[in-house]
Structure formats: C-alpha cells, structure tokens
Amino acid sequence: MNLSPREKEKLLVSLAAMVARNRLARGVKLNHPEAIAIISDFVVEGAREGRSVADLMEAGAQVITRDQCMEGIAEMIHSIQVEATFPDGTKLVTVHHPIR
C-alpha cells in the first residue's frame, strides 16, 4: 500500500484520536495532543460525511469539554485549523475556542 505523506498524516491523526477516545472512556483526562487529535478527527470525518464548514466550525467546539482535559489545556488551545476533504474539494476549517 503506497500512501502519500498527507494520507499518512491523516491516518496518524485518526489513530491518535482512537487512542485518546479509549483513554477518555477509561476516565483519563486528555492532554494537548490528544485533545487536538479528537477534534481534528471529528472535523475530517464530518467533512467526509458532507457536513458544511460552518457546521463543523460550530460543532467542533462541542466535541470536548473542559472537564475532560488536564488542567490548563483549554487555555492553551485558542483555535484548531484542519484541512479537510469535502465532497466539493479540500477546505480549511478553523474551530475557535474548541474546548469550553
């Protein structure tokens, strides 16, 4: 299987999100990379499903709560930018204040 660098990166983010979701299910609070991975994966998968950029910008800020993260993580992440493939092409989605 020959994957492009972009495809490898998408797989790595997806795998990191899976690990983070498993930790969250066990009651472990998320660190910075885990929180980013879960939100990024949510946006990428939402784009594949055909959701709009505006919808993902809003919904992406509701994926993780402050209580699910280690102390100070919410304040560290001001925005997350994800390049996602939509049915009509690739677009940049920015989620502002993603952990509330």
Swiss-Prot record:
InterPro entries, sorted: Urease_gamma (IPR012010), Urease_gamma/gamma-beta_su (IPR002026), Urease_gamma_sf (IPR036463), Urease_subunit (IPR050069)
GO MF terms, alphabetically ordered: nickel cation binding; urease activity
Cleaved signal peptide residues: none
Pfam short name (any one): Urease_gamma
Keywords: Cytoplasm, Hydrolase
GO biological process: urea catabolic process
Catalysed conversion reaction: urea + 2 H2O + H(+) = hydrogencarbonate + 2 NH4(+)
Entry's EC annotation: 3.5.1.5
Localization: Cytoplasm
Pathway connected to this protein: Nitrogen metabolism; urea degradation; CO(2) and NH(3) from urea (urease route): step 1/1
Superkingdom, taxonomy of origin: Bacteria
Gene Ontology CC annotations of this record: cytoplasm
Chief localisation class: cytoplasm
Quaternary structure note: Heterotrimer of UreA (gamma), UreB (beta) and UreC (alpha) subunits. Three heterotrimers associate to form the active enzyme.
PANTHER family, sorted: UREASE
Alphabetical list of HAMAP family matching this protein: Urease_gamma
Family that this chain belongs to: Belongs to the urease gamma subunit family.
Protein name: Urease subunit gamma
Protein source organism: Rhodobacter capsulatus
